[in-house]
Amino acid sequence: MNQAREIQQLASRFLYDECDRMYTDIGEWTEVQDCITQGIDSLTKLEGITPEEEAEAALAILMGYAVAVRNNRNIASTLKRARKVLPKIEDKVLKCHLTVFCYGECFDSKLAEEAHRLIGELKNEGKESEVVTVEALLESYEF
């Protein structure tokens, strides 16, 4: 699902980067926001073939709503979608990211515990660079 990854990358710019430096033109900023919103709308109608594809789509939707105009009904259905697929995901990095974004929407302590466990495992596997941003995001949610 290339579209899911594209939305994740666009949303990441707003979540993790200095987007105030990137978008000095309001027209460009609006264009990116519109692209994210259109991508979210498209992804809510698609279903992944594999658990990983479904997780990528759910993650992109939740990331998109973290930086764009929110739609609580779509967020709720995406959370259901994510919770259904989370136990089936083998990719720990993907599972960790999706778990953190789910936690950021519902603040379920079990999700936070799972995210911390996954972050710890990934660090022990030498994949710290892949979780540094999501770990900081988790900490900001727990604040």
PLM regions and their residue ranges:
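Terminal, low-structured helical/coil segments at or just beyond the last alpha-helical repeat
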Residues: 117-143
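Amphipathic alpha-helical repeat scaffolds of TPR domains
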Residues: 1-23, 48-67, 91-105, 132-136
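Short coil/turn connectors between adjacent alpha-helices in alpha-solenoid helical repeat scaffolds
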Residues: 18-33, 62-77, 103-115
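Short, flexible coil/linker elements and helix-boundary hinge sites characteristic
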Residues: 14-15, 72, 83, 90, ...
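Alpha-helical repeat scaffolds
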Residues: 33-46, 72-87, 111-123
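Unusually extended, aromatic-enriched hydrophobic runs near protein termini
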Residues: 85-122, 142
